[in-house]
Amino acid sequence: MDEEYDVIVLGTGLTECILSGIMSVNGKKVLHMDRNPYYGGESSSITPLEELYKRFQLLEGPPESMGRGRDWNVDLIPKFLMANGQLVKMLLYTEVTRYLDFKVVEGSFVYKGGKIYKVPSTETEALASNLMGMFEKRRFRKFLVFVANFDENDPKTFEGVDPQTTSMRDVYRKFDLGQDVIDFTGHALALYRTDDYLDQPCLETINRIKLYSESLARYGKSPYLYPLYGLGELPQGFARLSAIYGGTYMLNKPVDDIIMENGKVVGVKSEGEVARCKQLICDPSYIPDRVRKAGQVIRIICILSHPIKNTNDANSCQIIIPQNQVNRKSDIYVCMISYAHNVAAQGKYIAIASTTVETAEPEKEVEPALELLEPIDQKFVAISDLYEPIDDGSESQVFCSCSYDATTHFETTCNDIKDIYKRMAGSAFDFENMKRKQNDVFGEADQ
C-alpha cells in the first residue's frame, strides 16, 4: 500500500465506484478503499435477510414464512434507472452492462384523491385513462405533441414560448391544463420533488418530459429498469471496470487519517501505512468535518406477501404521491420489486416508501404510502441525514459526493458524478471519449 497514486477513493457507493471506473479508464492510477467488508456503502443491497434484521436491531430474526434468507437482496436506497437516462448511458459506454441483467419495471402509477392510477404509457392508454376528463385529454395531448416536437435549436418549434425566459407555469397556462394534470406532469413525468420548478424557465422541464418519453419508448411498459439481484450490483460492475484498468481495491480497510499538507490532500493513512495521492474522492462519512447537513430522508422498507392493490398484480412498479395531493412540500415515492428480480423469496414483494422529512414525525409523513401497501408483513424504518460538501474541493483536492436523495431514479446522482468529474479533471465528462478508449482496449472498432 505504500505507493503513490493519482487518485484515492474512499467508500464503494455508486458515485465513488463510477468515478473510480472513469478515472481508471482515463489512465489514472487508482486505489479504492472501503472500511466496510461489503460493496455499496449507503447504496448497498443487504443479504441474507438475517443481516437486514440485525442491521435494524430486530433481534428475533426473520420468521420461517420469509423463506430462505439467502434468497433476499434488499436495497437500502430504492432507485430505478431511467431507460434513456444518464446512468444507462454510463453503463453502455463503459460496457459495464456485460456484468448486469436488467428487467423493465412493469408500471408507473400516480396517486390522486386517495387512489392510484397508471401513468399512461401509450396514446391508447392515455385516452382510456381515468386520470383526466375528455377535453383535458385533448389539451394534454396537444401539450405532449408540443414537447415531443420541441427543439431548443429550432425556434420554429417554440410556438411563442421562450425556453430561457417563459416559466413552466405559463406553458401550462398556454395549454389550459388543470391542477391534477399539472401535478401529474410535473411529478410523475418530469419527476420534480417539489413545485419550485413552476416559476423557473421551462427548458429543463421540457427536457425532463422528453427524457421520460424517450425512456418509455425504449421498452414500452414504463421508463424504468432495475438490475436482477438488486442495486448493489451496480457499484460492483463499475468496480470490475476499474480493476480491468489496473485499479486496486481494498475492502474491510480502516481509514485512520486523511493527510493534508498546506491545506491540500497528500495521502491516506491506514493501519500504520500511508498511500500518497494527488486527489481524493470520498462519501460524506469519511470527512464529517467537511460536510454540512442538508435535510433528512425517511425510507421504510416493507416486506409484503402480495402485489400492491390496483397495480394489475405488477411484480414491480413505482408510485408517486404528488405533494399537492397530501398537503406537503415534497412528493412521497414507493418503489416495489419482488421475487421476479431475484431480490426476495418466492411470492414475496419488497416495497420501499421514501420522502424528504418535513416534520418532527417522519413516520406519519409516509402514512399515505403505507396505506397503499397494507397488509405489511414487516417494516424496517430508516431516517438518514443528507449531507453535502461545504466546498468544491478546488483547494484541498478532496472531492466529496452528496448523500443519495429521496428521488426514485439516478439522474441527480449522475449530475453529482459529472460535477465532481468536471471539478477534478477541469473539463466536462465526455461519454464519446470514454467509448473510444474502451474500444481500443477490447479491440472492438466502432462498426
Swiss-Prot record:
The modification Phosphoserine is found at S427. Belongs to the Rab GDI family. It holds the Pfam family GDI. Gene3D superfamilies: FAD/NAD(P)-binding domain (3.50.50.60), Guanine Nucleotide Dissociation Inhibitor, domain 1 (1.10.405.10), Guanine Nucleotide Dissociation Inhibitor, domain 2 (3.30.519.10). This is Rab GDP dissociation inhibitor alpha. Its main location: cytoplasm. It comes from Rattus norvegicus. GO terms for molecular function: GDP-dissociation inhibitor activity; GTPase activator activity; Rab GDP-dissociation inhibitor activity; small GTPase binding. One of its GO terms (biological process) is response to calcium ion. SUPFAM superfamilies: FAD/NAD(P)-binding domain. Regulates the GDP/GTP exchange reaction of most Rab proteins by inhibiting the dissociation of GDP from them, and the subsequent binding of GTP to them. Promotes the dissociation of GDP-bound Rab proteins from the membrane and inhibits their activation. Promotes the dissociation of RAB1A, RAB3A, RAB5A and RAB10 from membranes.
